[in-house]
Amino acid sequence: MKPSLLCRPLSCFLMLLPWPLATLTSTTLWQCPPGEEPDLDPGQGTLCRPCPPGTFSAAWGSSPCQPHARCSLWRRLEAQVGMATRDTLCGDCWPGWFGPWGVPRVPCQPCSWAPLGTHGCDEWGRRARRGVEVAAGASSGGETRQPGNGTRAGGPEETAAQYAVIAIVPVFCLMGLLGILVCNLLKRKGYHCTAHKEVGPGPGGGGSGINPAYRTEDANEDTIGVLVRLITEKKENAAALEELLKEYHSKQLVQTSHRPVSKLPPAPPNVPHICPHRHHLHTVQGLASLSGPCCSRCSQKKWPEVLLSPEAVAATTPVPSLLPNPTRVPKAGAKAGRQGEITILSVGRFRVARIPEQRTSSMVSEVKTITEAGPSWGDLPDSPQPGLPPEQQALLGSGGSRTKWLKPPAENKAEENRYVVRLSESNLVI
C-alpha cells in the first residue's frame, strides 16, 4: 500500500511538468516588438502587424496598439508629436488657460477663473503668456515643436492682397479728383463736359468747342437783341422780364384810360397822316396808313416809346396836349444813373441805358428836310397854318416848295447810338 501511495504524487508531477513549458513557448511566440501589434487573422501567415496611424506600441507585448494622447482635450500644446513607437507629449496650456506646470495629463482651466498672480495668466487672467514647451525624449531622438503664441499670422497671399487694395484705392480717388479739376478748367474756358459725344452739324461730326449759348443764331441780330436773348435764357431773368412787361403794359393802360382825348385840327387832304400818339418814328412800314387813327406800329403793343436825347427834347417844343411824358418815373429805391444816361431796360441789377452823343447846335434836329423848286400846290397855302402842330408844319411846304424825307448822309450812318450795360457797379459800353 505504501509504495503505491508514493507513486501517485510522482506520476502527477511528471504529468503536470510539460504544461508550463508549453504555455511559455506559446506565449513567447505571440509577443510583438514596439510599433507592432498581434495579428488576429492567422490566415495571413504573420503573427504581428504594424500599428495603424494614430496609435502606438512602446514596448514588447501581445497587447494591441494604443491611440495617441489628444492634447486638445486638455487644452494643452503638443510638445512632441506621437509616432508608432511613442505617445504624443503634451506641453504647456493654451494661451488664456492655466494649469499645473510639468503635469501634462491634467487639463487646463481658463484664466478668467484664475486668481491674481497665477502663473501663465496676466492682465486679470485674460491673456496667455508665451510658454516654453517641455522637451522630452531627447535620448529617443524625437523632434520637438516650438511653442506658439496667441496671434495668427496671415499668409503671403493675404498680405499681398491687402497691399494691393491699399495701393489701388488712392489711385482711383486721385483720378476722380483730377477729372473734376479738368472739367472745371474746361468750363472756365467756355467748354461743357458731357457724358456722351455730341455730333456736330459738320461732316466730321466735330464741334468748334464753343458754348452754344454764346453763338449768334442770326447774323443780322443787333447787340441789344443778343443781350436780351442771353438774359432770357435763365428762368429767373425771364420771369423778371415778364413781370416788367406786365407792369409796363398796366401803366400804359392806366395812362391811356386817364388821358384826355385830343383831336387834331382837320388837315388838308394832301398832308400825310401823322400818328396822334407820336411815341415813335415810322421807320418800319413808312408813313402811317390812312385806315385808322392809329398806325400799325401803335397797334402792336410790343414797341417801346422813342427816347429822345436831351438836346432834341430841348430843341423841340411839343404840344402838351398831344405828347405824353416820355420819361418814366423811377421806382422808389432804384439807383439813379449817371448824368445824361437814359434807362431803356432795367431788370434787377441789370440796366441798359442810352448815352446821347454830344452834337453841335447844327446837328440837333434828327429829321432834316430840304426844299426843292417845283410847281406850287394850288390847294396849299403859302405859309403853314398857325393852328397846326410843329410836326405838321415841318411836313408842309411853304411858297410852292415840296417837302421830302431824305436819308441821313453817309457819315451819319456810321454814327450809332451807344448803350451802356450796367451790372452792379461795372459798366459795359456798346
From Swiss-Prot:
Spell out the disulfide connections: 51-65, 71-90
Question: Where is it expressed, tissue-wise?
Answer: Spleen, lymph node, brain, breast and peripheral blood leukocytes (at protein level). Expressed highly in bone marrow and fetal liver. Very low levels in skeletal muscle, testis and colon. Not detected in kidney and pancreas.
**What is any one of the record's Gene Ontology cellular component terms?**
nucleoplasm
Residues annotated as glycosylated are 149
TNFR-Cys repeat feature ranges: 50-90
Q: Which domain of life is it from?
A: Eukaryota
Write out the topological domains of type Extracellular.
Answer: 26-162
Identify the Pfam families for this entry.
RELT
The UniProt entry annotates the motif RFRV motif at: 349-352
Phosphothreonine PTM positions read: 223
Q: Which residues lie on this side of the membrane: Cytoplasmic?
A: 184-430
Instruction: Cite the InterPro entries for this sequence.
Output: TNF_rcpt_RELT, TNFR_19-like, TNFRSF19L_N
Q: Please state the span of the N-terminal signal peptide per the UniProt entry.
A: 1-25
Q: In what way is this protein post-translationally modified?
A: Phosphorylated in vitro by OXSR1. Phosphorylated by STK39.
The segment annotated Disordered runs over 134-156, 373-410
GO biological process, alphabetically ordered: amelogenesis; apoptotic process
TM ranges: 163-183
Low complexity bias locations? 134-143
How this chain sits in the membrane, per its record, is: Single-pass type I membrane protein
Q: Where in the cell is it found?
A: Cell membrane; Cytoplasm; Cytoplasm, Perinuclear region
- Provide the alphabetized UniProt keywords: Amelogenesis imperfecta, Apoptosis, Cell membrane, Cytoplasm, Disease variant, Disulfide bond, Glycoprotein, Membrane, Phosphoprotein, Receptor, Signal, Transmembrane, Transmembrane helix
Q: Which disease is it linked to?
A: Amelogenesis imperfecta 3C: An autosomal recessive form of amelogenesis imperfecta, a defect of enamel formation. AI3C is characterized by generalized enamel hypocalcification affecting primary and secondary dentition. The surface of the enamel is rough and often stained. After eruption, the occlusal enamel on the molars disappears due to attrition, leaving a ring of intact enamel remaining on the sides.
> Of which family is this protein a member?
Belongs to the RELT family.
Describe, as the record does, how this protein assembles with itself and its partners. Interacts with TRAF1. Interacts with RELL1, RELL2 and OXSR1. Interacts with PLSCR1. Interacts with STK39.
Protein's job:
May play a role in apoptosis. Induces activation of MAPK14/p38 and MAPK8/JNK MAPK cascades, when overexpressed. Involved in dental enamel formation.
Name used for this protein in its record: Tumor necrosis factor receptor superfamily member 19L
* Species in which this protein is naturally found: Homo sapiens (Human)
